[in-house]
């Protein structure tokens, strides 16, 4: 019997003092801001993957990582796990090969999708 190979990924809404962190990615739609996301590594919990992805892409540390839901992703064999997290420390230091820009947005002033 063959079992499906699934690639789990995480997406996270990072909050700080009432604002939400959104980023524009280097290799995606130029003006589209999204939450941070990435694939889990072998042997890594989803919560640890959230912390690692945020740290790698922005230089920030997060805490209070809470599962919010899941959905199949539009790419073959992928499952997206959504989380909320709170900024814990650090200043933005972007991973230049992945993130073009990241900034904090007031929920009442989010960029258009």
In which residue ranges do the predicted regions lie?
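Cys/His-rich short segments
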Residues: 1-12
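Beta-strand scaffold of nucleotide-dependent catalytic cores
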Residues: 11, 21-24
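Short acidic-glycine loop/turn motifs at beta-strand connectors
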Residues: 16-18, 89
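A conserved beta-turn-beta hairpin within the catalytic core of GNAT-like acetyltransferases
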Residues: 28-31
């Amino acid at each position: 019997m063959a079992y499906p190979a699934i690639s789990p990924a995480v997406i996270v809404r990072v909050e700080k003092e009432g604002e939400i962190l959104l980023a524009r990615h280097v290799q995606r739609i130029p003006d589209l801001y999204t939450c941070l996301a990435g694939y889990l590594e072998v042997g890594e919990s989803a919560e640890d993957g959230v912390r690692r992805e945020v740290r790698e892409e922005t230089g920030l540390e997060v805490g209070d990582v809470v599962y919010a839901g899941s959905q199949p992703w539009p790419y073959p064999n992928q499952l997206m796990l959504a989380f909320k997290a709170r900024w814990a420390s650090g200043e933005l230091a972007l991973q230049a090969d992945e993130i073009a820009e990241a900034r904090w947005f007031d929920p009442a002033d989010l960029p258009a999708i």
